[in-house]
């Protein structure tokens, strides 16, 4: 069995173990601090007991002698001292327990310190191992740098996309009409991005699963290779033992053969000596030798031949054994080379396995980083979608608000059209009635003179009452404008004021909506709109002043007409009933009738203006105080109640005016009765005069 290489622990595992140990140490420190902190003192209850028992002693001491009171005080003092002693004993015991706990905690802290020291030693070992793996990490750093560059490029692309999305959001905020289409496009793009992200996630999950499967396959193959290596090593060890035994046997046989060879060589040498001696003897002069000697010589020669043959056989055996030994040595060398090659292959496989594991770890880290980036991108897209949805809701609310405003404007226009139709009908009716009256006046000129005198009086009364109403309306407009300015300065928001309208038809709607209270500030309005509305306030003030001046001109015109009527009356009285001037007088009468119609229309408009002012304006009390002074004191030239008509006729006229004009606000329905408001009473008093004329 070859020794397996020591693999270092993963740095992430080391960091996790370190963090876990630090968290455990922090928890122990917190527990130690909590135990060390002093608890609630037990003397509070005793103090309460003292306070509870003190009134009893005082009450009981009121009826006894001073000696008893001193005795009781001493008893109380003894009780309090005993209680304090008990408390001190309890505190001592608690301090002892705390001391034990502190000692126990110190022991635990020592243990934790030892564990930390061991962990530090392990970390030092891992650092040494990591220094050995520095060469491999350089290659991984190169790959990580390339990946970081790639991620930087992707981050730049994402930053550009974010800028583009911000520009799109600004465009959405600017234009309401283009928001819907752009929003649909962005929804489509976001859905496409989500689909792409989901595909990427699925691909990464699949790749991760494939990598895990590949890792499992590699680990299984490594296990199989290790098993095969172990089996092959066992087989090689067995063969080595066999070859060693055979080599030992062969070496033993070679030694025995060498010894036999030496013996044979020694015998051969002895035989050669003996042969040489015999040859020498044979070389001597022949003598009669016995046959025994010849036979001995022949035997010796045969033995020598036999020995030579044995020596030759032994030499062949030796050569064959040497050749076998050489072949065995070659085989052993080849087997050693094979074993070395296999060991190198196994080492290379182990190194490849380590590299593959490192590469898989790097790939897993990259996949985790990609998943994190994808999750961050998804969160960003979700946040963008939420922002866009909020903006859509705001835009929808603004659209709804604009639609409501449009509906209100349409309703106001419809009301104005209805008013115009009603006024036209009233004008037609008045024209018909005036034509009938003119016919009667032509038939009876004397009655016409009396009527003209009455009209003159009524015109003077109208002038005075119109002036008073004009002053009151001016005060009302100024108060309303000042209140509106104060509210706008405090709130710094947009006040929804009605438009100027087209011509004289929309003046009534402007004057009706002018004194209404300011609406609540909408939350969706931007600061630019608020500042622009605040800068437009002087323009609105100027428009209000122009409207007041127009009304003043409208009220000044009937006064001029009455002056003309007076002049015509003086001329008529000076000339008398001349037939040539009758035609001019009739023309003057017609003109007066037209001016009276205009006065009636303006009075109706004033009535429509005053009713919402009285009902909805916040400074109604000031208006009543300013209006009750002329109501209590009769003005010079004002007609008596008998001349103006009965109260029933006034009520009838009030009901007709409300039916024919705009419906009053709920505040006007509560507070706008003609008997409670002096300006309304004056307008109602003017109405029967106009009916009489």
UniProtKB/Swiss-Prot annotation:
One of its GO terms (cellular component) is Golgi cis cisterna. Residues 20-71, 497-547, 629-693 are annotated as: Disordered. It holds the Pfam family GOLGA2L5. InterPro entries: GOLGA_cons_dom, Golgin_A. Residues 537-547 have a biased composition (Basic and acidic residues). The keyword Coiled coil applies. Residues 73-611 form a coiled coil. Residues 679-693 have a biased composition (Polar residues). Keywords: Coiled coil. It comes from the Eukaryota. One of its GO terms (biological process) is Golgi organization. Belongs to the GOLGA6 family. This is Golgin subfamily A member 6C. It comes from Homo sapiens (Human).
């Amino acid at each position: 069995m070859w020794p397996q290489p020591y693999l270092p622990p993963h740095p992430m595992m080391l960091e996790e173990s370190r963090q876990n140990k630090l968290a455990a140490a922090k928890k122990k420190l917190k527990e130690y601090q909590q135990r060390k902190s002093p608890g609630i003192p037990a003397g509070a209850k005793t103090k309460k007991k003292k306070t509870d028992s003190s009134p009893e002693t005082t009450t009981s001491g009121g009826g006894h002698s001073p000696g008893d009171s001193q005795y009781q005080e001493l008893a109380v003092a003894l009780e309090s001292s005993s209680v304090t002693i008990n408390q001190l004993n309890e505190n001592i015991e608690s301090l002892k327990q705390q001391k034990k706990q502190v000692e126990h905690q110190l022991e635990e802290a020592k243990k934790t310190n030892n564990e930390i020291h061991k962990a530090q030693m392990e970390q030092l070992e891992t650092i040494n191992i990591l220094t050995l793996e520095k060469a491999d990490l350089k290659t991984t750093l190169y790959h990580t740098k390339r990946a970081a560059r790639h991620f930087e490029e992707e981050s730049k692309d994402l930053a550009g996309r974010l800028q583009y999305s911000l520009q799109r959001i600004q465009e959405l905020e600017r234009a309401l009409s283009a928001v819907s289409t752009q929003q649909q496009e962005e929804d489509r793009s976001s859905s496409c991005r989500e689909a792409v992200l989901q595909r990427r996630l699925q691909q990464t999950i699949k790749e991760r699963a494939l990598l895990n499967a590949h890792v499992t396959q590699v680990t299984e193959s490594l296990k199989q290779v290790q098993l095969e290596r172990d089996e092959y090593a066992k087989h090689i060890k067995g063969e080595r033992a066999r070859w060693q035994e055979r080599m030992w046997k062969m070496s033993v046989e070679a030694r025995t053969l060498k010894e036999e060879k030496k013996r044979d060589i020694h015998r051969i040498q002895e035989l050669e000596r003996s042969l040489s001696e015999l040859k020498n003897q044979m070389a001597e002069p022949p003598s009669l030798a016995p046959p025994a000697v010849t036979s001995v010589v022949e035997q010796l020669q045969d033995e020598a031949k036999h020995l030579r043959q044995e020596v030759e056989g032994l030499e062949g055996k030796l050569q064959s054994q040497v050749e076998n030994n050489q072949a065995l040595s070659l085989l052993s060398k080849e087997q050693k080379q094979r074993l070395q090659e296999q060991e190198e292959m196994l080492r290379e496989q182990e190194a490849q396995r380590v590299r593959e594991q490192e590469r898989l770890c790097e790939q897993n880290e990259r996949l985790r980083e990609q998943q994190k980036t994808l999750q961050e991108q998804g969160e960003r897209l979700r946040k963008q979608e939420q922002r866009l949805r909020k903006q859509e809701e705001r835009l929808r609310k603004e659209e709804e608000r604009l639609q409501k405003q449009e509906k209100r404007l349409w309703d106001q226009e419809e009301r104005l059209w209805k008013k115009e139709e009603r006024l036209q009908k009233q004008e037609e009716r008045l024209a018909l009635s005036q034509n009938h009256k003119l016919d009667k006046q032509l038939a009876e000129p004397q009655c016409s003179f009396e009527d003209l005198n009455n009209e003159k009086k009524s015109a003077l009364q109208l002038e005075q009452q119109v002036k008073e109403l004009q002053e009151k309306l001016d005060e009302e407009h100024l108060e309303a404008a000042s209140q509106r300015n104060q509210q706008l300065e405090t709130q710094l928001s947009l006040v929804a004021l009605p438009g100027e309208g087209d011509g004289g038809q929309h003046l009534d709607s402007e004057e009706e909506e002018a004194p209404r209270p300011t609406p609540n500030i909408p939350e969706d309005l931007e600061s630019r709109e608020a500042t622009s509305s605040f800068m437009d306030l002087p323009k609105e003030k100027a428009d209000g002043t122009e409207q007041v001046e127009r009304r003043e001109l409208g009220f000044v015109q009937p006064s001029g007409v009455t002056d003309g009527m007076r002049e015509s009356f003086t001329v008529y009285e000076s000339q008398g009933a001349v037939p040539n001037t009758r035609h001019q007088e009739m023309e003057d009468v017609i003109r007066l009738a037209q001016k009276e119609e205009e006065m009636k229309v303006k009075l109706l408009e004033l009535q429509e203006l005053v009713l919402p002012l009285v009902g909805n304006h916040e400074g109604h009390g000031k208006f009543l105080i300013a209006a009750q002074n002329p109501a209590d004191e009769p003005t010079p030239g004002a007609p008596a109640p008998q001349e103006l008509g009965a109260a029933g006729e006034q009520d009838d006229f009030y009901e007709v005016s409300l039916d024919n004009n705009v419906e009053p606000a709920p505040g006007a329905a509560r507070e706008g009765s003609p008997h409670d408001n002096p300006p309304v009473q004056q307008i109602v008093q003017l109405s029967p005069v106009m009916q009489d004329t």
